[in-house]
Amino acid sequence: MTILSTITSISRPNKISKSFVSSNGGSSISMGSNSVACYNACGGGSSYSYSSSYSGSGLDYSYKANYSSSTGNNSYVVIASSTCNCN
């Protein structure tokens, strides 16, 4: 996990476009939690769109960083592609 800690910084352009992911046990992906993460990341009041696409299996997935507002910790989960656009 120490290697993955180097990917936590994400640029913040005027119109934010980021990847947000959430999982249970680091393997199964939860759409509901993803939507909550997207809502929180957009400030809780901004409108947003959310989309996901998955491919591959096991180690073919890429690792992304996810910040959990409930625990205050960063966790690393397995996803293929997940994007949140703040309007």
From Swiss-Prot:
InterPro entries: HssA/B-like_chaperone, HssA/B-related. It comes from Dictyostelium discoideum (Social amoeba). PANTHER family: HSSA/B-LIKE PROTEIN 1-RELATED-RELATED, HSSA_B-LIKE PROTEIN 1-RELATED. It comes from the Eukaryota. This is HssA/B-like protein 57. GO terms for biological process: sorocarp development. Belongs to the hssA/B family.
